[in-house]
Amino acid sequence: MQSRRAVCAAALCLAVVPAHAATGGSGAFRGFIESLRPDAAARGVSAATFDAAFRGVSGPDAAVLARIRQQSEFVRPVWDYLVGAVSDGRIVRGRARAAALAPTLAEIRNRYGVPAPVLLALWGIESDFGASAGSVPTVRALATLAEARHRGSLFRDELLAALTILQRGDVTPARMSGSWAGAMGQVQFLPSTYLAHAVDFDGDGRRDIWSSDSDSLASIAAYLKDLGWDPAVSWGYEVALPEGFDLSRYAADIDDFAKRGVRRTDGKPLPGHGRASLFLPGGSGAPVFLITDNFEVIRGYNTSDSYALAVGHLADRLDGGPPLAAPWPAAGARLDGPGLRELQSALAAGGFYEGPQDGRAGPRLREAVRRYQISADLPADGYATPALLSRIKDRSGSRP
């Protein structure tokens, strides 16, 4: 299935769009649009729907192309991201929405098994509870991305999916809007994700993620359920580790962590069942989390570790939980995009990393860092730092 993870991956490819594609004339752009007509018709899109969708779309969106070029090197530390994503104002607004929508949220949980705080947290981060759903016309944005990335099919397929939505009558071209990358409405679904997972919860005959709170929240819940959400466990917990804790044993049953002295920072007991793994997004001495498979489900919505952590922590705060107990590391103790690419290359040369050298942090790089740290008899926190990169380069003889 396509999801917003596809946008994250594709943005890196789009960052290298050739100049001639980014500045192509309107004639070439219109030619590209016309080339879509046979495939759209094969999907059941009528000529009238096709023409209505592209009425007034005479050329690519320059603002979208500018966002592509800005995207590639943008790496934000998790602690900076959390400041905005889990702000006091958002917590207040989210709790107010929770009270106003309590009956609807209860019905959605009964049907899909996803708790209200998680739904509200996702909704809050995606569109500030529906207040900031994005105003970029989806068809033009996707056409711009598809034409600029003509050798790839992702955005072309998403554009055809958007036309299918219009054909089905869930929304008009004028109301189909969202982000610059084609993610739509209050829940920021790509069109293919919408077709696969959006639901008509209020029963009005339309899956309306643009103006219906209940459809939006239920669509989030349906998507998480389809991604594998487990109603029996949380997303994770902030924990404190005992002195001398062996970080190399970072994945185990939750009760095993409890037996090894791991404790929740809020004083509540860990559950007695389920699997989990340690996540140290700021390295040793920063907040430590015990994350479950539901954390990975959230990453299915958006692959960013920072995003998944923000959703989980905001959900806890909306549910009355405390702020994080441990402080974050000092500014500068992290690698940016070019530094992460260099680290990926160095780890790959040593046989620790297999994967794209894309300058993106994530589970694959985290595991590679841990393997190196274990081999070097270092604390296996999985955290990529400038000091770690310098150590690897010094020992490999790659430093100039």
Cite the ranges covered by each PLM segment.
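Short acidic, glycine/serine/threonine-rich helix-capping segments at coil-helix boundaries
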Residues: L335-L340, S345-I392
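Catalytic glycan-binding domains that act on GlcNAc-containing polysaccharides
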Residues: V45-H273, P287-F289, I298-G337, G359, ...
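Bacterial N-terminal signal peptides
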Residues: A9-A15
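Intrinsically disordered, low-complexity Ser/Thr-rich linker and spacer segments
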Residues: I392-P400
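Boundary at the C-terminal end of the N-terminal hydrophobic targeting segment
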Residues: A19-T23
